[in-house]
């Protein structure tokens, strides 16, 4: 995949990486300078595109690809083994998924849980929102595949660089600072409750947790938990099986990092979203190649937030 726009943390890049597709993004003028059927080399490691490669370049990159595939195969020896740091601390390695069918890949590759189920992708590439039963099927499929291992489901994280036309979100000058993620869900409670009900119902099949995106204040957690309580009451009155689940948040804004002690009183767990946290802290549009040099998670302020 080669695109003219999109930075290294855009979701197109995230999905390409997850699917093992070589990708080079933000290549200015590529659509004008490349013709259909033209031979290209996309070097996703160096972020380089070679047009009309010579035989020597083709030979070089075929060799590189063979070496890369062998390196991937060599990692199989670590399958099923515990993950331990040099200092002897035991860790768990989780996988992130965008579709229910991705869960099996996590299991097959030795993943010890799902750290992030990006549920927004269930809402994309369609002309209406998924029903409660459709979402229930997706979430329960993942829970069953993980067989008791932890599954963290992030509620609808829409807006910003993830547009869904049928949700009718107004075009904004600064979409990353606007009506998105938990802000959208708390204003569209029926859509939100449909998702929450599906998650609660699916929780009976595994170790599911709910994670709220882009939280900036304590009240957002309280409002979400109140809606979850409403959903539980409804499911009980309808005689539908469910399981209550822990509710955590993504810490991906400077405000959440600064008041993390207060948020911890309401949230069962934190997940640090370094992509957005870095972007908001450094005041950098993560999809703008002109300022991408400022997008650096190793800046001292990033460690201050952590």
Task: Give the location of each predicted region.
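Conserved alpha/beta-domain cores
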Residues: 73-306
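Acidic, glycine-rich flexible loop/linker segments
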Residues: 1-111
């Amino acid at each position: 995949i080669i695109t003219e726009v999109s930075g290294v943390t855009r979701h197109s890049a995230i999905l390409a990486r997850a699917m093992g597709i070589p990708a080079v993004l933000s290549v200015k003028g590529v659509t004008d300078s490349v013709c259909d059927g033209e031979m290209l080399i996309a070097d996703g490691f160096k972020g380089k595109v070679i047009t009309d490669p010579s035989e020597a370049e083709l030979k070089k990159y075929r060799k590189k690809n063979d070496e890369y595939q062998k390196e991937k195969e060599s990692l199989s020896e670590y399958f099923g083994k515990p993950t331990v740091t040099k200092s002897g601390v035991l860790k768990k390695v989780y996988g992130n998924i965008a579709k229910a069918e991705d869960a099996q890949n996590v299991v097959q590759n030795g993943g010890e849980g799902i750290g992030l189920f990006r549920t927004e992708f269930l809402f994309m590439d369609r002309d209406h929102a998924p029903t409660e039963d459709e979402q229930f099927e997706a979430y329960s499929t993942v829970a069953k595949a993980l067989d008791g291992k932890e599954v963290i489901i992030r509620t609808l994280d829409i807006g910003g660089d993830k547009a869904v036309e049928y949700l009718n979100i107004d075009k904004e000058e600064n979409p990353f600072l606007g009506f998105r993620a938990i802000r959208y869900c708390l204003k569209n409670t029926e859509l939100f409750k449909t998702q929450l009900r599906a998650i609660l119902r699916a929780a009976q099949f595994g170790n599911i947790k709910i994670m709220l995106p882009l939280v900036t204040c304590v009240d957002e957690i309280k409002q979400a938990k109140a809606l979850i309580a409403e959903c539980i009451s409804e499911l009980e009155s309808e005689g539908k099986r469910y399981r209550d689940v822990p509710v955590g948040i993504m810490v991906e804004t400077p405000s959440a990092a600064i008041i993390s002690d207060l948020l911890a009183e309401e949230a069962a767990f934190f997940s640090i979203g370094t992509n957005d946290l870095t972007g908001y802290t450094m005041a950098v549009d993560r999809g703008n190649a002109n300022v991408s040099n400022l997008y650096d998670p190793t800046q001292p302020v990033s460690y201050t937030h952590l």
